[in-house]
A protein has these predicted regions:
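Conserved active-site-adjacent core of cysteine acyl-enzyme catalytic domains
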Residues: 15, 26, 77-199
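Active-site-adjacent structural segments surrounding the nucleophilic cysteine of cysteine proteases
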Residues: 1-91, 158, 197-199
């Protein structure tokens, strides 16, 4: 019944998968560094924010891009405030998300990041292999969408493809989204960090 409610848009419970729900067959897995850390969640920022999953998603992307050190709660709060100041309350379409993201990354000390639209599992896998988190706009009904952050993936021999996500409601990246599954993927935007210049 919960699954049916989710598909009809009567709840915010998206039918994401847990690790023990995934196929048991051998697979190829990619995982960004630092995915075991605590991420920002919408529940951390109730006032004055509403429908702020896009800002939380962007804050979590910035956390991933700062893999060289531990990100404490104060830093998570600061990154969220930056993202929220530029993105505001949702719902946000992909174009609006991308427009605010460049400025937020620059202000967070991550200049030179590039946004790359991804339209296939292969493109997403390639970006994740390079260490780029991917902002994913998903929907379960025409009026019920949500931003999540892909921080890894699994690809099986039968071609099934799962994204490891920070869903914005749980502090750990322990949910999975199946490509072509019941939760529809509307867009994927990889956030590619500027490469350090090679020393001569």
């Amino acid at each position: 019944m919960d699954y049916l409610k989710a598909l009809l848009g009567m709840t915010n419970e998206y039918p994401f998968f847990r690790k023990n729900d995934l196929p048991a067959e051998p697979c190829r897995e990619i995982r960004l560094a630092g995915t075991g850390r605590r991420f920002a969640v919408t529940g951390d920022y109730q006032e004055p924010a509403r429908n702020h999953c896009a800002a939380v998603c962007l804050a979590n992307a910035m956390i991933c891009l700062k893999t060289d050190r531990t990100v404490k709660q104060e830093e998570r709060d600061r990154l969220f405030r930056r993202a929220y100041a530029l993105l505001g309350n949702g719902p946000l379409f992909t174009r609006e998300f991308r427009k605010g993201t460049g400025n937020a990354l620059f202000e967070a000390g991550l200049p030179g990041c590039r946004l790359r639209p991804c339209g296939s599992p292969g493109e997403v896998r390639s970006c994740l292999e390079k260490g780029s988190p991917c902002a994913v706009l998903v929907m379960i009904s025409s009026l019920n969408w949500h931003w999540v952050l892909a921080v890894g993936c699994r690809e099986y021999e039968d071609g099934s493809f799962y994204l490891r996500i920070c869903d914005g409601w749980n502090a750990r990246a322990d949910r999975w989204l199946r490509w072509g599954g019941p939760v529809r993927i509307r867009s994927v935007t990889a956030i590619e960090k500027k490469k350090a210049a090679a020393s001569l």
